[in-house]
């Protein structure tokens, strides 16, 4: 790192902290992305295999990974892990199947639907993460959670959740399922989450379209505490327009009682 400028050294240190990668990987990724830290971290998380210089895949024991898959595979269909296998997988990881950590693993595996992994999803996902054991996967979980601190990666994770959660063949996401997943992924990120859920249960009572799901993330990150910055003429879904109309008097009422 001696040949680098001080500003570049700072970026290398930040990159290493953020991605939990080595100095060699940090220098390689930053130099390929014009030393733009945000671009480099985003590209690293999207395609880690292009930048990781340590031979993660080379040190992977394929036979061990196959044996691990065999532990979880569906007895009736050897090409997938069914609900019982998922439960065993979660037990081995000491994780609640309904936890956000399990959802993050499903995202990293690019799983198509909840409560199962195809053999390809499991094998490719574990390989990409450089894991051939439950212990190695456990050690990766904090890094995956760290990855979600980058807004672009969280958005990818959030949008993945809609397709993962809905029933195959359905366009929308059932309301109860949508609320359950919103409580999981937007907890601590959307100040009006409880009010949003109340509004949906009282006034909507229908499935949630993909467009509404995706735009709620944008809404949650821009809306002011009193909703005064909401643009009714903007390209927001009608459901969000209706929510703002429902919520504003309640927010104003809460403020007047606390003053």
UniProtKB/Swiss-Prot annotation:
<keyword id="KW-0656">Proto-oncogene</keyword>
<dbReference type="GO" id="GO:2000436">
    <property type="term" value="P:positive regulation of protein neddylation"/>
</dbReference>
<dbReference type="InterPro" id="IPR005176">
    <property type="entry name" value="PONY_dom"/>
</dbReference>
<keyword id="KW-0833">Ubl conjugation pathway</keyword>
<feature type="site" description="Essential for interaction with UBE2M">
    <location>
        <position position="115"/>
    </location>
</feature>
<dbReference type="Pfam" id="PF14555">
    <property type="entry name" value="UBA_4"/>
</dbReference>
<keyword id="KW-0539">Nucleus</keyword>
<dbReference type="InterPro" id="IPR009060">
    <property type="entry name" value="UBA-like_sf"/>
</dbReference>
<dbReference type="GO" id="GO:0097602">
    <property type="term" value="F:cullin family protein binding"/>
</dbReference>
<keyword id="KW-0007">Acetylation</keyword>
<keyword id="KW-0832">Ubl conjugation</keyword>
<comment type="subunit">
    <text>Part of an E3 complex for neddylation composed of cullins, RBX1, UBE2M and CAND1. Interacts (via the DCUN1 domain) with the unneddylated cullins: interacts with CUL1, CUL2, CUL3, CUL4A, CUL4B and CUL5; these interactions promote the cullin neddylation and the identity of the cullin dictates the affinity of the interaction. Binds neddylated CUL1. Interacts (via the C-terminus 50 AA) directly with RBX1. Interacts (via DCUN1 domain) with the N-terminally acetylated form of UBE2M and UBE2F. Interacts preferentially with UBE2M-NEDD8 thioester (via N-terminus 1-26 AA) than with free UBE2M.</text>
</comment>
<dbReference type="GO" id="GO:2000434">
    <property type="term" value="P:regulation of protein neddylation"/>
</dbReference>
<feature type="modified residue" description="N-acetylmethionine">
    <location>
        <position position="1"/>
    </location>
</feature>
<keyword id="KW-0963">Cytoplasm</keyword>
<dbReference type="GO" id="GO:0031396">
    <property type="term" value="P:regulation of protein ubiquitination"/>
</dbReference>
<feature type="domain" description="UBA-like">
    <location>
        <begin position="8"/>
        <end position="45"/>
    </location>
</feature>
<dbReference type="GO" id="GO:0005737">
    <property type="term" value="C:cytoplasm"/>
</dbReference>
<dbReference type="InterPro" id="IPR014764">
    <property type="entry name" value="DCN-prot"/>
</dbReference>
<comment type="function">
    <text>Part of an E3 ubiquitin ligase complex for neddylation. Promotes neddylation of cullin components of E3 cullin-RING ubiquitin ligase complexes. Acts by binding to cullin-RBX1 complexes in the cytoplasm and promoting their nuclear translocation, enhancing recruitment of E2-NEDD8 (UBE2M-NEDD8) thioester to the complex, and optimizing the orientation of proteins in the complex to allow efficient transfer of NEDD8 from the E2 to the cullin substrates. Involved in the release of inhibitory effets of CAND1 on cullin-RING ligase E3 complex assembly and activity.</text>
</comment>
<protein>
    <recommendedName>
        <fullName>DCN1-like protein 1</fullName>
    </recommendedName>
</protein>
<dbReference type="GO" id="GO:0005634">
    <property type="term" value="C:nucleus"/>
</dbReference>
<feature type="domain" description="DCUN1">
    <location>
        <begin position="60"/>
        <end position="248"/>
    </location>
</feature>
<dbReference type="Pfam" id="PF03556">
    <property type="entry name" value="Cullin_binding"/>
</dbReference>
<dbReference type="InterPro" id="IPR042460">
    <property type="entry name" value="DCN1-like_PONY"/>
</dbReference>
């Amino acid at each position: 790192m001696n040949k680098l400028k001080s500003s570049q050294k700072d970026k290398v240190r930040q990159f290493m902290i953020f991605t939990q990668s080595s100095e060699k990987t940090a220098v390689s990724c930053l130099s390929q992305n014009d030393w733009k830290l945000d671009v480099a971290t985003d590209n690293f998380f999207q395609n880690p295999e292009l930048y990781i210089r340590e031979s993660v895949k080379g040190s992977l024991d394929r036979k061990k990974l196959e044996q691990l898959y065999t532990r979880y595979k569906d007895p009736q269909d050897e090409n997938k892990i069914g609900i019982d296998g998922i439960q065993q997988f979660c037990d081995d990881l000491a994780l609640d199947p309904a936890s956000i950590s399990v959802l993050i693993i499903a995202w990293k595996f690019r799983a198509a639907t909840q409560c199962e992994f195809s053999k390809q999803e499991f094998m490719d996902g574990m390989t990409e993460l450089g894991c051939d054991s439950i212990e190695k996967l456990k050690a990766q979980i904090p890094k995956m959670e760290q990855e979600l601190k980058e807004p672009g990666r969280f958005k990818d994770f959030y949008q993945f959740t809609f397709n993962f959660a809905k029933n195959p063949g359905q366009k929308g996401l059932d309301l109860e399922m949508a609320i359950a997943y919103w409580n999981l992924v937007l907890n601590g990120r959307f100040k009006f989450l409880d009010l949003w859920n109340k509004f949906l249960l009282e006034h909507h009572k229908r499935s949630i379209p993909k467009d509404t799901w995706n735009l709620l993330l944008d809404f949650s990150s821009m809306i002011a505490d009193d909703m005064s910055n909401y643009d009714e003429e903007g390209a927001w879904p009608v459901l969000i327009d209706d929510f703002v109309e429902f919520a504003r008097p309640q927010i104003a009422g809460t403020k007047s009682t606390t003053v």
